[in-house]
């Protein structure tokens, strides 16, 4: 799905996630990377300035709930989750920003009271490495590039884009349309195959 072409055609949606949410009347949903590193995003296609505004207690709590639900749907009975901070060093007790104190921390505490096994806020520069090494089963990223860079650095062909919270199963490849190689017979279908396999995995445990 080419974002530029879609906007040129007058369509307001930022991506698949927003389109399917509108079509299904879904209010609470999130984008998730599913692969060797499993990451769900608090915000996606918006400016970094706007991403900071969207890191509210309610939104972070909603995403923690959705991630917990998604992991259970894939057969994990008691997922152990991590939540990244928004600021360097997760704010360092308010020295580098107070979103962790005002919004993210309270969301985590409420999730814990609901019985969700979740830790954080954890400094963004270490949380994804810990998740990859098995300390956590999945992680919440605060914004698009925070999660995308971590996932794509090693696992570009294995990352599948999922929308969690919809009444349907939705997965897709995690790369663009690549118009520059269209018709040349050199496209790699590995990621498409992986997207189908992940959809099957969600379906088995639905």
Model-derived features: positions:
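Anion-binding alpha/beta catalytic cores of soluble intermediary-metabolism enzymes, centered on
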Residues: 1-99, 105-206
